[in-house]
């Protein structure tokens, strides 16, 4: 059954206003293995500063492939709720639940948007709210961030990753991403190659100059150590990912502190290209 919401989503993809993230995640599932899943668990443990999530509830906002919902479930989360606005991403998350979730796992999967304040409010409060690289693709990043903060319980944690603001460079990337989504399908791969290969060639050349040419090769072969991800699928996601918004770390801090959040951990991309990661704790009411 096609709902009005799914027709709107399909229309946005068709018109070039939105990247089909779920299709890229579907391809990622073909390379997903136990090693990548283990790396996803490691990344959650490291950023949250916990060995497990036993007894905690976990909300995955924009679940994408479903990998981190799965990781949370495997770390012992008492309850996992995943939602995504992209129907293909919902399908990916359901597929991972089917493949890997043990019997009795409390893991709900739904189709919804982080911009739907009523939906987010209806979910109640969670111990961990996770949204990695999602809110800046909603089309209204600050509204989406405001919505998801309401799902964090007192003393709970908010773990987000937001694209770093590079000023004029970010504007150029926004134009490239918009172009990707307006191109016919056969022209998209050539654009990815044209945009990213010069960067890759420069990285390879630096490895050669340092006398360590295999470092570049390992950057590809060992990439699964980066949150269990795939470098190629991340490149496609990067070039195509649209809508596209950015923020400086200070803007995120200034937005969340008045809403009762304290920064617990931050991992930036050094002012360059990529996402800044934040873990906040919600202060209990006085």
What kind of feature is each model-predicted range?
Residues 1-36:
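N-terminal, positively charged/glycine-rich alpha-helical extensions of SAM-dependent methyltransferases
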Residues 35-54:
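Conserved alpha-helix/loop element of class I SAM-dependent methyltransferases that forms part
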Residues 56-62, 157-190:
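Conserved class I S-adenosyl-L-methionine
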Residues 71-116:
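Class I SAM-dependent methyltransferase SAM/SAH-binding core
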Residues 119-128:
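A short acidic, Gly/Pro-enriched loop at the edge of an enzyme's catalytic core
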Residues 142-154:
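A short glycine-rich, Lys/Arg-flanked "PGG" loop and its adjoining helix->strand segment in the class I
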Residues 184-258:
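Substrate-binding/catalytic lobe of Class I Rossmann-like enzymes that use SAM or dcSAM, i.e.
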């Amino acid at each position: 059954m096609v709902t009005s919401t799914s027709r709107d989503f399909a229309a946005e993809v068709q018109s070039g206003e939105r990247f089909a993230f779920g299709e890229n995640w579907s391809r990622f599932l073909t390379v997903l293995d136990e090693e990548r899943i283990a790396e996803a668990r490691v990344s959650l443990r490291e950023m949250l500063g916990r060995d497990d999530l036993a007894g905690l509830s976990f909300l995955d906002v924009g679940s994408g492939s479903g990998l981190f919902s799965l990781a949370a479930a495997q770390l012992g989360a008492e309850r996992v709720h995943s939602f995504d606005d992209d129907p293909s991403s919902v399908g990916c998350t359901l597929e991972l639940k089917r493949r890997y979730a043990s019997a009795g796992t409390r893991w709900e999967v739904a189709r919804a948007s982080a911009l739907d304040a009523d939906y987010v409010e209806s979910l109640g409060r969670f111990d961990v709210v996770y949204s990695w690289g999602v809110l800046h693709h909603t089309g209204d990043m600050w509204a989406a961030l405001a919505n998801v903060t309401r799902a964090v319980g007192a003393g709970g944690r908010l773990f987000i990753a937001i694209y770093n603001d590079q000023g004029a460079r970010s504007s150029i990337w926004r134009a490239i991403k918009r172009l990707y989504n307006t191109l016919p399908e056969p022209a998209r791969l050539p654009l990815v190659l044209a945009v990213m290969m010069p960067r890759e060639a420069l990285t390879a050349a630096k490895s050669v100059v340092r006398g360590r040419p295999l470092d570049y090769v390992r950057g590809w072969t060992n990439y699964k150590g980066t949150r269990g991800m795939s470098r190629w699928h991340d490149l496609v996601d990067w070039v195509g990912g649209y809508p596209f918004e950015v923020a400086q770390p200070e803007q995120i801090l200034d937005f969340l502190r008045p809403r009762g959040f304290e920064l617990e951990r931050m991992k930036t991309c050094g002012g360059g290209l990529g996402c800044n990661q934040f873990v906040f704790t919600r202060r209990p009411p006085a």
